[in-house]
Regions:
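Glycine-rich phosphate/pyrophosphate-handling loop used in enzymes and phosphotransfer proteins
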Residues: 1-221
Length: 221
């Protein structure tokens, strides 16, 4: 993009902080200084997800990150993926180093992709892979539409809701691979567990996962 076009876009659509909406001096900076110091950072307390050796996330699922994720998913703010990936890479680059060969994502259904116009977890995975300098590959597909996990209360009901909805997209690409699975949020871990079950069944040797945010224990109910 040439300098004039960049200037014109900034004039017509002035860049704003993705967290509070404050006007920013240029589009290269997506978070204002105040918000940058006021983030709900995850302390890194070990989170056990069945089938995974490690789970990495930079934040708890709290404000202002929560609202930014919702705008990203439901209001077309695809540009947020880059900044989310920068934050995720800063954490995952250390915590998951040497534990994966390829990056993939938790896919949404075709219906959900049509409604939103994109798959938010795919955008995250591709942006994160660029930040980490890693290979990225679609390995799973969601072949059956189900209720939104956010509408279901309780870990057991969430596990039942996702049971059997994923299958391998490219079984040959899974076998003997160490895989980093990306999603936007981890709450009960039911979705990650179901994806992990499919990947391990088809020959994955090690699984780790990463998300933008993770729920506190009292948010998983």
């Amino acid at each position: 993009m040439n300098a004039f076009l960049s200037w014109l876009l900034d004039l017509l659509f002035p860049p704003k902080c993705m967290l509070c909406g404050k006007l920013m001096p240029d589009a290269a900076t997506m978070v204002c200084e105040k918000c940058g110091y006021d983030l709900p950072e995850w302390e890194g307390v070990p989170r056990k997800i069945k089938g995974y050796d490690a789970c990495s996330a930079p934040f708890f699922y709290e404000e202002p990150i929560r609202s930014a994720i919702l705008r990203f998913k439901f209001h077309g703010m695809q540009s947020y993926a880059k900044q989310f990936a920068v934050w995720m890479a800063a954490r995952a680059g250390e915590e998951l180093k040497g534990k994966y060969d390829v990056v993939t994502w938790v896919p949404c259904s075709r219906r959900r992709r049509w409604e939103r116009g994109f798959d938010q977890s795919e955008l995250l995975a591709r942006a994160l892979a660029r930040e980490l300098g890693a290979e990225v590959c679609p390995l799973l597909q969601k072949h059956r539409h189900n209720r939104k996990q956010s509408k279901i209360k309780g870990a057991a009901r969430r596990r039942a809701n996702v049971q059997g909805v994923y299958r391998p997209l490219a079984p040959g690409e899974i076998r003997n691979r160490r895989i980093l699975v990306v999603d936007d949020i981890v709450t009960t871990g039911a979705t990650m567990e179901e994806c992990g079950k499919v990947l391990l069944l088809h020959g994955a040797t090690q699984l780790v996962c990463a998300a933008i945010a993770i729920a506190r224990s009292d948010q998983k109910k």
